């Protein structure tokens, strides 16, 4: 199922995501891992919307939560590139499929996920006390 799903999504390498991260301060990256995973190590500015809650939380993204109507938030987000990351790339691919089902098109799954990001030595943050 995951291999089939990955064939239907656009994957981006962590090197390319890092370039975009440096170039665009308002880059939309969503970490779909569970909160415990996210708190341990994450990409700065990535928002944590776990896979199981993604469709319900997407309209609350900080870049669009100024809208009073959920439809306006979803419309604005659907016009932007959105990069989804998980542990190794599987959950982000499944998340893309879910977002495509509600009308999103400009979606990218981070190939190799956080593991690839960490392996390349790119900056991370931790939210553990």
Descriptions of predicted regions:
Residues 1-28, 35-81, 90-129:
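Rhodanese-like catalytic fold shared by cysteine-dependent sulfurtransferases
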Residues 84-85:
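Short, surface-exposed ligand- or partner-binding patches at beta-edge/loop junctions that are enriched
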């Amino acid at each position: 199922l995951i291999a089939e799903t990955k064939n239907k999504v656009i994957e981006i390498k962590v090197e390319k995501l890092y370039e975009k991260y440096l170039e665009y301060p308002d880059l939309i990256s969503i970490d779909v891992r569970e909160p415990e995973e996210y708190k341990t190590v994450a990409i700065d500015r990535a928002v944590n919307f776990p896979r199981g809650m993604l469709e319900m939380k997407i309209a609350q993204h900080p870049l669009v939560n100024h809208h009073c109507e959920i439809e306006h938030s979803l419309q604005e987000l659907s016009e932007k590139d959105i990069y989804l990351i998980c542990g190794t790339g599987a959950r982000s691919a499944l998340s893309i499929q879910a977002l495509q089902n509600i009308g999103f098109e400009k979606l990218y799954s981070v190939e190799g996920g956080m593991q690839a990001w960490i392996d390349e030595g790119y900056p991370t943050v931790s939210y553990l006390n």
